[in-house]
Amino acid sequence: MDYENLKEQWSEVEDRDGVRLSWNVFPSTRMEASRLVVPIGALYTPLKEKPDTPLLQFEPVTCKQPCRSVLNPFCQVDVRARLWICPFCLSRNPLPPHYKDITANAIPPELHPSNTTIEYRLSRPAPSPPIFLYVVDTCQEDDSLNALKESLVMSLSLLPENALVGLITYGTMTQVHEIGYTECAKSYVFRGSKDYAPKQVQEMLGLGQMPVRPGMQPQPGRPMPMGPASRFLMPVSQCEFQLTKALEQLQKDPWPVANDRRPLRCTGVALSVAVGLLESSFQNSGGRIMLFAAGPATEGPGMVVSSELREPMRSHHDIDRDNIKYYKKALKFYDTLAKRTAHNGHIIDIFAGCLDQVGLLEMKGLSNSTGGHMILVDSFTSSMFKQSFVRVFEKDGDDNLLMGFNGILEVLTTKELKVTGLIGHAVSMNKKSTSVGETECGIGNTCSWKMCGIDPTSSYGIYFEVAQGGPSHAQPAQKGMMQFLTYYQHSSGQFHLRVTTIARNIGGPAGDPAIAQSFDQEAAAVLMSRIAVFKAEVDDGPDVLRWVDRMLISLCSRFADYRKDDPSSFRLEKNFTLYPQFMFHLRRSQFLQVFNNSPDETAFYRHVLNHEDVSNSLIMIQPTLDTYTFDQEGGQPVLLDSASIQPTHILLLDTFFHILIFHGETIAQWKKAGYQDQEGYENFAQLLQQPKEDAMELITDRFPLPRFIVCDAGGSQARFLLSKLNPSTTHTTGAYGGVGAQTAQTIFTDDVSLQTFMDHLMKLAVSGTN
């Protein structure tokens, strides 16, 4: 089967099951697997929206303990004996009595060959409606605070009627607003400089009295008997007026700030009070703590910088030199808080609206461990914030929020495979099973992970190894299988279970060409990028780049055709040709190169990469570039190369985080002269309009909203484009500073070009000594 057909097949599987694998035929031995270089991995989007996934209104049929796999199309069913055989543990299970009428032609939906992904609506109701607790920074200028208040008031109308909402504001002090008290505005105040233990928070808020009685089953539709926390968290339908009033009356923090100081801001206390409030009464009920930070924490636990302006925020350089006063202590504080929050089943979203850093680097664990969002904007007045914030509350066709709470993902494998770990926004459930591997990749040593927050685009990299071989005379299996079970609280108030079961052939003896043909270079590039970013969090930058290079050289020397020590004979098959260039762009990307980015930006970019699926991640690693000219209709894809910059062309660059329209030199001059407004130049006006329309289309379903930039050749904003292009025409190419560089853009850089990179790669791959 040729590569184009295979790609189409993989994309159909992705649409149906939300899965892309690095290898679509599995090696038969551990030895063979180690020679593949790229691990067997799956990029899985559990809640991928697909209208045709059947939603079954009954409990799933499961295998006996400890296996608990779910009945699926790959099970053998003996209709006469009313039995089914589990492909994972090979146990025989009786079919339930109500399946007595099934025949070979009349089978239940979960056994239908096309239903490899299926969803069950379980009878277990959620313990309470979803909770939204707004934590608002009041140390900000009036225009920014007013814009934020508007967005928050508007968001109340997007929440389900029964959702519980609450409000905490903070500056020098933290205030918990008692919205259940209607006589006047009333709030509980916590000192910003003090570290409160969970018990103290609960006592001060008077939450210790009435724990929910164990064994009391919540009834769908009937509200839980509310404890003392109902003074702070109330259904939107009951408190919308009161909360709107409280939000509208918010004012800038009254504490005076000297000219040479930052405002005193106790972000750490505000978050730990929010976590304590939800922890006391709503453990393992779906809820979001939404933090709106307008600057860095300068006071109390979790402070990231002092209030003196002469002390700058830490940079990557400071961190490398260990010149960091608050970093380790703050990181420890937020990581402990993140563990607590994840254990309680709650989500923390961070919305940072500030030109300076707010401390995302220290706080990143809060969102990364709980599946929360992280949005980085210059100000809450920007449309980037307003539109991204609205998208958090998007709904499906049945008017339910497109967000799941308290998810648990469990992975089962047949005996040939073992799971080594997961990279994505989750925490380990420390669950051991026969499916758990010996090695560890990402969050390992478990077959089950907890995702407090999960949405239809949340994607997880799951990595596998081949099990140690059994006796050599044993009959090798024909197929290796995996089953992904995702339990989560649906926003309609019930628990759901999404089941995806996939099977792939197992290759023949060593060197089976089917394995090489089954390599999906796009999925592999994204899975390897996640490992590289995971390593970059703990290792030095240069070490990670060396690891990326070593892996690429090994892969090429294993799968390319060449004569030893002859680089000119080097050839890669079609399904490997793009992989080296993905790695070239990954090495230069902001995920691994921190130069020119603040530590907060690096934390943000890495957070988003670990959330997205294959196609979006590839745009981040290797942005797309389209060109628009008079002699063609619409945009045409061109190489991400400095040679693509031409004076009479318009370029549209999509890096996922930025969408940029670049006018070549001549186009920019015509535009400046106003030709587009003159009669007879309608085609020029049309040419200027076309990339804008295409850019708007790209923005429509993107989250977080990308920054939109329009710039001209020679303008300062053009740096966003130049930094992404392969520098094939630099000030050093060609004699006298570049022959042939009259038309293409000269890029002033010491970075190697893709061509030089490939030359070195070929040389190293064909020399048997790598």
Curated annotation (Swiss-Prot):
Keyword line: Cytoplasm, Cytoplasmic vesicle, Endoplasmic reticulum, ER-Golgi transport, Golgi apparatus, Membrane, Metal-binding, Protein transport, Transport, Zinc
Molecular-function GO term, any one: zinc ion binding
Topological category with respect to the lipid bilayer: Peripheral membrane protein
Location of the protein in the cell: Cytoplasm; Cytoplasmic vesicle, COPII-coated vesicle membrane; Endoplasmic reticulum membrane; Golgi apparatus membrane
Keyword Transport attributed: yes
Highest taxon above the source species: Eukaryota
Keyword Iron-sulfur appears in the UniProt entry: no
Binding residue positions for Zn(2+): C63, C67, C86, C89
Any one GO cellular component localisation term in the record: Golgi membrane
Residues making up the signal peptide according to the UniProt record: none
Swiss-Prot/TrEMBL GO biological process terms: COPII-coated vesicle cargo loading; intracellular protein transport
Function recorded in the entry: Component of the coat protein complex II (COPII) which promotes the formation of transport vesicles from the endoplasmic reticulum (ER). The coat has two main functions, the physical deformation of the endoplasmic reticulum membrane into vesicles and the selection of cargo molecules.
Subunit text: The COPII coat is composed of at least 5 proteins: the SEC23/24 complex, the SEC13/31 complex, and the protein SAR1.
Family in the record: Belongs to the SEC23/SEC24 family. SEC23 subfamily.
Protein name as annotated: Protein transport protein SEC23
Species of the source: Pyricularia oryzae (strain 70-15 / ATCC MYA-4617 / FGSC 8958) (Rice blast fungus)
Lineage: Eukaryota, Fungi, Dikarya, Ascomycota, Pezizomycotina
Encoding gene (name): SEC23
